[in-house]
Regions:
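Hydrophobic-ligand binding "helix-grip"
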Residues: 39, 46-47, 54-111
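Tryptophan-centric aromatic hotspots in well-structured domains and transmembrane helices
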Residues: 29-32, 41, 78, 122-123, ...
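Hydrophobic ligand-binding cavity/cleft-lining segments
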Residues: 1-46
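Short, charged low-complexity linear motifs
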Residues: 14-16, 26-27, 103-111, 135
Length: 139
């Protein structure tokens, strides 16, 4: 039996993506949770974005912020408007020295290979937009 890419025993299908940026963890965190940064990777919020609260975006993403540890990570429910399932997204900030940080996206509880492929394309596009925005800021 061949193992399917991204299939786990415990959390269904997953997709992960990470990239190192020439920023401190605090700089990376501050950008990703600024209005511009949130707009890129999460969308334009139509609600407050707070721990243990539901959120929604103009793009039709909704969920609940479950864990929020500044300069470390966020874990939240994440659902597209067209989906029947609630998935989980975790964004981590990992220091690689004083001025380098890995920004890591892990998307769990995807329903299958098709949803994983959709999210692979989605998060790669988001990472490209994050990179372009940071490059434009001189980072």
């Amino acid at each position: 039996m061949t193992k399917q890419a991204g299939k786990t025993r415990d959390v269904g299908f997953v997709f992960g993506l990470r990239k190192t940026f020439p920023l401190s963890v605090q700089q990376a965190w501050d950008f990703m949770f600024s209005k511009q940064g949130l707009g890129i990777w999460l969308g334009e919020l139509t609600t407050d974005f707070e721990l243990q609260k539901s959120y929604s975006t103009q793009e039709g993403i909704e969920g609940v912020v479950r864990v929020l540890k500044p300069d470390s990570h966020i874990r939240m429910g994440w659902k597209k408007e067209s989906w029947t399932n609630m998935s989980t997204v975790q964004v981590r900030f990992i220091a690689k020295g004083a001025d380098k940080t890995v920004i890591s996206f892990l998307h769990e509880k995807l329903t299958g290979a098709q949803q994983r492929a959709e999210m692979k394309e989605y998060w790669n596009q988001k990472m490209d937009l994050i990179t372009k925005a940071l490059d434009a800021m001189g980072n």
